[in-house]
């Protein structure tokens, strides 16, 4: 067992294609950088090998909109159930079809493949593109298919308690759906990434030369020397954090990638572990990269931007 990477969860970015274009979307920039969807056979192999080798607690499929490719999603979760992964999640915008029969068919197939958690994004942003009556039909179909846990997952701006036009709209939408026996997950906060940097600047925090925080403090991050979750990209690359890739499972066995992971052998990771964002800046300067003089909204944005600037110098 690798002391730096003890896999408890695996996530699949099935696709970065989407049938919406939400104004806050963080993943839209990935749409043209990857194949249309992950290879089904590769995904199956990864789930089988990782599920048999490690005691995984959960698996998730997401996107983009993963249910643009329901067959792939179902194959992934059927194998996950077969190897004993207990929590099998799909996060979706709920826009599977305009046809009620097709929506019910997809929900039935998801249930039969072993999906036991459906997380539906509902908020002011998604409902600019996804009709509420479709969301209702999707949620009802999931309940009828007896999927164990169905939840709403709203995105809040600044905080759930902040009184702004987007949060007010989100609360109105949730009110419209409250007759359904579906829990609210509590949701997440809008991240200063992707389209939010263009469309929602007025709601972003002030930029700082070195934003506060460290890996593990920020949602969806972990200390780089104590990773519990890996993400599989549509091209097979394996990420331990945003754009931090440790190899490609289509070229190297997934178990070998996991077992050989050593963040102290990756200079930028080593710098972050030992000295945080200041360490990353010092490392970047040795490579001829200067941080943005205007600063950054978050440590994640800072880390990603600096590493991408370094890659452009190659």
PLM regions: where:
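N-terminal [4Fe-4S]-dependent radical SAM core
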Residues: 1-11, 209, 280-286
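Conserved alpha-helical substructure of the radical SAM core
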Residues: 1-92, 97-105
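Short cysteine clusters
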Residues: 18, 22-25, 236, 241, ...
């Amino acid at each position: 067992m690798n002391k730096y990477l003890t896999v408890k969860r695996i996530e699949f970015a099935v696709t970065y294609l989407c049938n919406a274009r939400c104004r806050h979307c963080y993943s839209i920039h990935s749409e043209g950088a990857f194949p249309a969807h992950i290879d089904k056979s590769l995904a199956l192999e990864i789930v089988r090998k990782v599920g048999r080798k490690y005691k995984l607690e959960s698996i998730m499929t997401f996107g983009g909109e993963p249910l643009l490719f329901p067959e792939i999603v179902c194959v992934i979760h059927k194998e996950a159930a077969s190897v004993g992964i207990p929590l099998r999640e799909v996060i979706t915008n709920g826009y599977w079809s305009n046809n009620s029969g097709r929506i019910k068919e997809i929900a039935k197939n998801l249930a039969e493949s072993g999906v036991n958690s459906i997380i539906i994004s509902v908020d002011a942003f998604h409902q600019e593109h996804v009709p509420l009556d479709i969301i209702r039909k999707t949620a009802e179909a999931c309940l009828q298919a007896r999927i164990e846990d169905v939840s709403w997952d709203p995105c809040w701006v600044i905080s759930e308690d902040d009184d702004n036009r987007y949060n007010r709209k989100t609360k109105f939408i949730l009110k419209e759906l409250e007759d359904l026996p579906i829990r609210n997950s509590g949701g997440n906060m809008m991240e200063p990434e992707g389209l939010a940097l263009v469309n929602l600047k007025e709601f972003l925090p002030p930029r700082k030369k070195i934003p506060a925080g460290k890996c593990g403090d920020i949602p969806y991050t972990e200390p780089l020397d104590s990773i519990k979750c890996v993400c599989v990209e549509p091209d097979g690359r394996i990420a331990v954090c945003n754009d931090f890739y440790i190899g490609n499972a289509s070229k190297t066995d997934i178990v070998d990638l996991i077992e050989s992971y050593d963040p102290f052998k990756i200079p930028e990771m080593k710098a972050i572990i030992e000295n945080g964002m200041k360490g990353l800046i010092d490392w970047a300067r040795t490579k001829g990269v200067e941080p943005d003089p205007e600063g950054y909204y978050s440590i994640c944005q800072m880390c990603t931007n600096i590493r991408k600037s370094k890659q452009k110098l190659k």
